[in-house]
Amino acid sequence: MLSVAKRLDAISEWGSVVALTYIAAQRSFVDYSDMADAKAMLESITRSFGLIYGEARHVRINTISQSPTATTAGEGIEGMEQLRLFADRMSPLGNADADDCADYCVALFSDLTRKVTMQNLYHDGGFSSVGITGSALEQIFS
């Protein structure tokens, strides 16, 4: 899609492209399977086309690694609701919901982030940086 957009000059100079990914692109998550591979490829395309399109038209291309979020696609993943609840408990700020994600996308489309490109930006309430919380340990061993 990005290759066609570049060939057709379909994105304005200094435009922004944002795609959604998930932490399973970098870490193992049970039952995420082929989707993890697809998300890893998406993040790689973000870096590659971020360079190509950035040099050509200053187009910014980023991915957002979102919290486990209740979506139509997510409903097809076995155990997704349990993962969402677990991530919410592990995140110092709690999970970011779909509305929070939409707000973050708007910020990335704005000129306030005009120098942010080729990044995978975590939007997960801190889940991606936490090893384990005290409350999770208590839950595991109680």
Predicted regions and their residues:
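Hydrophobic positions on the long internal alpha-helix
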Residues: 1-8, 45-46, 104, 108
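A glycine/serine/threonine-rich, flexible loop-to-helix segment
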Residues: 56, 63-90, 100, 131-142
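Short, small/polar-rich loop/turn modules that mediate ligand/substrate recognition or access, typified
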Residues: 14, 55-60, 116-118
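Catalytic loop of short-chain dehydrogenase/reductase
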Residues: 9-55, 66-70, 94
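Generic structural signal for alpha-helix termini and adjacent loop/cap motifs
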Residues: 7, 110-114, 132
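C-terminal helical subdomain
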Residues: 63, 81-116, 121-125
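Residues immediately C-terminal
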Residues: 128
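Short glycine-/acidic-enriched loop or helix-start segments at secondary-structure transitions
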Residues: 29-30, 119, 132-133
